[in-house]
């Protein structure tokens, strides 16, 4: 039955290999790009007076020079500067769009002179991405009487938008309506936009405040990896909705919008926006107002839109109304987003893609975050996390290793039963079960620690892949990005030879592995040497190859994950050795290593 126990462990390990190979070899297919081109529509009121008007406007100005550089596009309109400790950019006075934003704390690569990350870009530049606010015309109101994408706003207060220094814009339609927009920003990534309209005419008007996030085409840096959500994310009445980029054009055509769209009506305390790997933009309407959240795709213009529209308001002569909306545009930092959730943004922490194992990924990241804050190094934080996980699982591991030690003690009796049963496998199995029952041994107990490690491994992989705190997180020496594969390579003797190794992620990098995968293979191999090699030749060969197969297979994974696996193997080795010795079984590690290198002689036939 010892062979059966090894078969159980082997089956689990091979299943694990299949799952990991699937991650590497079978990412989701690339989506087809939709047709491109520009079109122009305008704000049109809903047929029902007093209901939410449709927002079907072209978010771009009527005159756009496509394909120009970002710097050239920024020069097409007067601007108000945005400057804080964490972001820089500008607001276009043409349309009042927030369309120029970069994140000072993040660079595109780890090079010291690398460009900082660009979050929002103006119309006309590659990958235009911006936020637009305004008032949708209600029943009886001419759309030309409300501000649109071609509206030229005037600055009436504030030269530079910064923390505690808002900017106020104004536009008068010349027909008795004056529109004012106050834009504020905090010390992180949250804008607050307060829109108001004053009616000095002789007749009441009905308008509805809206906010639009527009992206021209899909992002160029899509990961297209099924463990990561990229696309639209929305929260409506406590329910999170995620829509992938390639699913948005497949929406049914909305009769009022005339384009593929999906609406969520009468939402309280909701939000909607676009999420990327590490960055996100989200519209957050007044939580006390009943809002409509819309995801929309304009196929001819190839523009994706996320919209919020608040209920229409009637502005009587001589009065004014206002509405406040927030805009988050920045990095998906756990602590920053958690603070916004504490301030009232419902379930904002779930904008980070925690995955199916959220009940594991959330606490794992929580521990990593605070271990890193305490230690000051994410690599050592991963090792500390491994120690904590192994300590939590120690009671189960103890029972497993005790059972394995007892199995070793029963080996002579098991061999005797095999000899007595001969070819009668049923008799042998019955005898084995009686022996296990008598000695109170569970032959499958050795599988339990391995089974428990599988969801933990996947959860940590998810955390390392999706959280920005692991992006460019250094360990030591050459390991300056724990979210990237090991940059070292045996090709240049790990930096001793005067040339670079293969590009990380390439086929050559999988062959000429780095230091960390090598240590992983060695740690797995040593862990096996706690027990004698299986007597079955097939099992013996599979067990002999397994550490080195894992070594090459995991060589292309994030180095932080490999650090976890090395630490896990090392701690498991120590735990198993000490527990088995405490039960009277003394693992002969050096003897098993020596035996593994000895040439096996074929037994004499009888």
Curated annotation (Swiss-Prot):
GO terms for molecular function: membrane insertase activity. Keywords: Cell inner membrane, Cell membrane, Chaperone, Membrane, Protein transport, Transmembrane, Transmembrane helix, Transport. It is a multi-pass membrane protein. GO terms for cellular component: plasma membrane. It is found in: Cell inner membrane. Its main location: membrane. InterPro entries: Membr_insert_YidC (IPR019998), Membr_insert_YidC_N (IPR028053), YidC/ALB3/OXA1/COX18 (IPR001708), YidC/Oxa/ALB_C (IPR028055), YidC_ALB_C (IPR047196), YidC_periplasmic_sf (IPR038221). GO terms for biological process: protein insertion into membrane; protein transport. It comes from the Bacteria. Residues 33-59 are annotated as: Disordered. The chain crosses the membrane at residues 8-28, 116-136, 348-368, 374-394, 448-468, 506-526, 542-562. Interacts with the Sec translocase complex via SecD. Specifically interacts with transmembrane segments of nascent integral membrane proteins during membrane integration. Belongs to the OXA1/ALB3/YidC family. Type 1 subfamily. Required for the insertion and/or proper folding and/or complex formation of integral membrane proteins into the membrane. Involved in integration of membrane proteins that insert both dependently and independently of the Sec translocase complex, as well as at least some lipoproteins. Aids folding of multispanning membrane proteins. This is Membrane protein insertase YidC. It comes from Roseobacter denitrificans (strain ATCC 33942 / OCh 114) (Erythrobacter sp. (strain OCh 114)). The gene is yidC.
């Amino acid at each position: 039955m010892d062979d059966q126990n090894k078969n159980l462990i082997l089956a689990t390990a091979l299943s694990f290999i299949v799952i990991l190979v699937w991650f590497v070899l079978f990412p989701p297919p690339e989506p087809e790009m939709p047709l491109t081109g520009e079109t122009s529509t305008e704000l049109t009121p809903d047929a029902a007076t007093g209901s939410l008007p449709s927002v079907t406007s072209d978010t771009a100005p009527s005159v756009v020079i496509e394909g120009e550089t970002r710097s050239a596009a920024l020069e097409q309109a007067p601007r108000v500067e945005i400057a804080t400790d964490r972001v820089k950019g500008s607001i276009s006075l043409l349309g009042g769009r927030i369309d120029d934003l970069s994140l000072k704390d993040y660079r595109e690569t780890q090079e010291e002179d690398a460009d900082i990350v660009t979050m929002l870009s103006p119309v006309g530049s590659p990958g235009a991405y911006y936020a637009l606010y305004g008032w949708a015309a209600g029943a009886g109101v001419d759309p030309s009487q409300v501000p649109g994408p071609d509206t030229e706003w005037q600055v009436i207060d504030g030269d530079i938008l910064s923390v505690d220094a808002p900017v106020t814009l104004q536009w008068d339609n010349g027909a008795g309506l004056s529109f004012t927009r106050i834009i504020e920003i905090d010390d992180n990534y949250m804008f607050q936009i307060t829109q108001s309209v004053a009616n000095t005419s002789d007749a009441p008007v009905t308008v509805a405040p809206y906010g639009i996030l527009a992206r021209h085409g899909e992002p160029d840096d899509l990961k297209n990896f099924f463990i990561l959500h990229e696309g639209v994310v929305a929260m409506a009445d406590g329910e999170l909705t995620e829509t992938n980029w390639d699913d948005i054009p497949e929406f049914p055509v909305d009769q009022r919008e005339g384009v593929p769209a999906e609406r969520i009506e009468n939402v309280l305390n909701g939000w909607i926006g676009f999420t990327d790997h590490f960055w996100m933009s989200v519209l957050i309407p007044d939580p006390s107002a009943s809002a409509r959240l819309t995801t929309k795709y304009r196929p001819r213009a190839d523009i994706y839109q996320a919209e919020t529209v608040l209920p229409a308001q009637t502005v009587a002569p001589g009065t004014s109304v206002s509405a406040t909306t927030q805009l988050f545009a920045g990095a998906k930092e756990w602590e920053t987003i958690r603070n916004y959730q504490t301030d009232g943004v419902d379930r904002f922490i779930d904008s980070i893609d925690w995955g199916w194992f959220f009940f594991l990924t959330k606490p794992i990241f929580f521990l990593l975050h605070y271990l890193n804050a305490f230690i000051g190094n994410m690599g050592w934080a991963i090792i500390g996390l491994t120690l904590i996980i192994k300590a939590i699982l120690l009671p189960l591991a103890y029972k497993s290793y005790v059972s394995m030690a007892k199995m070793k003690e029963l080996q002579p009796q098991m061999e005797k039963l095999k000899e007595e049963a001969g070819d009668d496998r049923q008799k042998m199995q019955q005898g084995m079960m009686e022996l296990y029952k008598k000695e109170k041994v569970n032959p499958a107990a050795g599988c339990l620690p391995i089974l428990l490690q599988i969801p933990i491994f996947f959860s940590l992989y998810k955390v390392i892949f999706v959280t920005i705190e692991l992006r460019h997180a250094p360990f030591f020496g050459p390991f300056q990005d724990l979210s990237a594969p090991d940059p070292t390579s045996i090709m240049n003797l790990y930096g001793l030879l005067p040339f670079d190794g293969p590009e990380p992620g390439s086929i050559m990098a999988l062959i000429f592995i780095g230091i960390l995968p090598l240590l992983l293979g060695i740690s797995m191999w040593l862990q096996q040497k706690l027990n004698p090699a299986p007597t079955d030749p097939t099992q013996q060969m599979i067990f002999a190859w397994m550490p080195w197969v894992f070594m090459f297979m995991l060589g292309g994974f994030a180095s932080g994950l490999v650090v976890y696996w090395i630490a896990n193997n090392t701690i498991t080795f120590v735990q198993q050795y000490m527990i088995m010795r405490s039960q009277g079984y003394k693992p002969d590690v050096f003897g098993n290593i020596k035996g593994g290198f000895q040439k096996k002689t074929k037994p004499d036939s009888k």
